[in-house]
Design a protein with these regions (language model features):
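Membrane-interface interhelical linkers
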Residues: 1-14, 18-69, 78-90, 137-155, ...
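C-terminal structured domain segments across diverse proteins
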Residues: 216, 236-243, 252, 259-287
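Structural signature of transmembrane alpha-helices in multi-pass secondary transporters
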Residues: 12, 37, 41, 94-101, ...
């Protein structure tokens, strides 16, 4: 990979880890927080998107399709993420969610397309599974009982991550949609989709904004920024290389979960996160 791609991946991973830690802190706010961050991201990205569209007019039907599908998937992702962070530790949910996507891509390739992974692919899949087991069971039975809900949500979120990663990669490559326009359109449609919920809960929305406006701003900026950086990296390097490399963020989050939130079993969870990253890297090397 070129230095530019490496820089894009590292900055994107750090930004992604940061906003997830903020979401964990605000997880009790639920769908209203998700709506507020979508509105905030739209406010930030729409003016930039207008300039990009004027300078390089897109195919509007392709952009509309790409943004609509991505918005549905991302709404599901953010709602599941909120539920996961309410139910479990960030040091469990985040690594499992980020490691499940690449593993599922291998499973889908075997089941749907009849592909047969080589030794590296099988070793990578085994490493991801081993990392999941270490995170869930590393502290013994007591840790498993405490981590069970987080494990469930982490795996469920990973399914959604696999879906939106494949779709968005298709949008910026095959459909040639600008990453900035895709994110601007997606954030706008996310806000539109969730507006009925926000209207029904308007007093709650006002309360969340009053208490968590700083968190809303951080997530509204860093969430699209982290993803835009990765999408640009996907334009410069193969998706099979970029997608696994960005998972270095799981180590950042596992460490932060211990340092910031005093989550238990830091050695087991950090070790499991490192094993997951290694497994994802092996999956990438096998392609």
């Amino acid at each position: 990979m070129s230095p530019v791609v490496i820089l894009l991946i590292l900055v994107g991973a750090l930004a992604h880890a940061t906003w997830n830690l903020v979401v964990k802190r605000s997880a009790i706010s639920g769908p209203t927080f998700v709506w507020l961050t979508a509105v905030g991201a739209g406010i930030v990205l729409l003016p930039i998107g207008v300039v990009v569209a004027l300078l390089e007019p897109p195919s509007w039907p392709d952009l509309a399709l790409a943004a609509a599908v991505s918005a549905v998937l991302h709404v599901g992702y953010f709602l599941a993420l909120q539920a996961g962070y309410r139910a479990g530790d960030v040091g469990v949910v985040y690594p499992l969610a980020r490691g499940t996507g690449p593993l599922l891509s291998v499973v889908f390739a075997i089941v749907l397309f009849g592909e047969r992974p080589g030794p590296l692919g099988l070793l990578g899949a085994a490493a991801v599974i081993a990392g999941v087991v270490v995170i869930g069971l590393g502290g013994g039975r007591a840790n498993w009982r405490a981590a069970r809900a987080g494990v469930f949500w982490g795996l469920a979120i990973g399914v959604v991550i696999a879906a939106y990663t494949l779709w968005d990669a298709h949008a910026v490559t095959a459909l040639a949609v600008s990453p900035i326009l895709l994110n601007a359109g997606t954030s706008t449609m996310e806000a539109v989709l969730m507006t009925p919920i926000a209207v029904r809960r308007w007093p709650t929305v006002r309360g969340v904004l009053r208490r968590h406006w700083r968190d809303v701003v951080v997530v509204a900026v860093l969430s699209p920024l982290s993803y835009i950086l990765i999408l640009f990296a996907m334009r410069l390097a193969p998706v099979s290389v970029v997608a696994p490399a960005r998972e270095i963020s799981v180590v950042f989050v596992a460490l932060a979960g211990w340092l910031l939130f005093k989550e238990p079993h830091p050695v087991a969870r950090l070790s499991g996160a490192v094993v997951v990253v290694a497994g994802v890297a092996l999956l990438a090397a096998s392609r």
